[in-house]
């Protein structure tokens, strides 16, 4: 795995999932869903911003997630807690979620 310092994969501004679309306007999250099932769908959409096999410093993860919502720390924590990303010593990498092939 290589460490990257840039931005991510540029996920679509309009999510495919109709539930996720309810929480997104102009490519940004208008709210973080409280219901776990809906939050997982949103997290899956966000996880696609991160390239599989790449390692990201925390500052880059913060910047990438900050493009979607001001509470990037909560999003980062949720991504790790729900298994979409893993973390070790300030570095993050994608560990799950939907992959486009």
Which positions does each model-derived feature cover?
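A short, conserved structural fragment
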Residues: 81-92
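Short acidic, hydrophobic short linear motifs in intrinsically disordered regions
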Residues: 52-65
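Short alpha-helical segments that sit at the start of domains
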Residues: 13-50
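Amphipathic alpha-helical segments within well-ordered protein domains
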Residues: 44-47, 62, 66
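Short amphipathic alpha-helical interaction segments
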Residues: 68-78
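N-terminal regulatory modules of eukaryotic gene-expression and nucleic-acid-associated proteins
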Residues: 1-14
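Short, cationic-aromatic polyanion-contact patches
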Residues: 1, 91-101
């Amino acid at each position: 795995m290589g460490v990257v310092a840039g931005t991510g994969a540029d996920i679509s501004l309009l999510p495919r999932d109709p539930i996720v679309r309810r929480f997104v306007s102009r490519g940004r999250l208008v709210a973080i869903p409280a219901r776990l099932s809906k939050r997982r769908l949103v997290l899956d959409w966000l996880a696609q911003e991160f390239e599989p096999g790449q390692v990201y410093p925390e500052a880059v993860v913060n910047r990438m997630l900050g493009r979607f919502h001001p509470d990037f720390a909560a999003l980062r924590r949720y991504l790790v807690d729900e298994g979409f990303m893993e973390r070790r010593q300030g570095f993050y990498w994608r560990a799950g979620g939907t992959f486009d092939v």
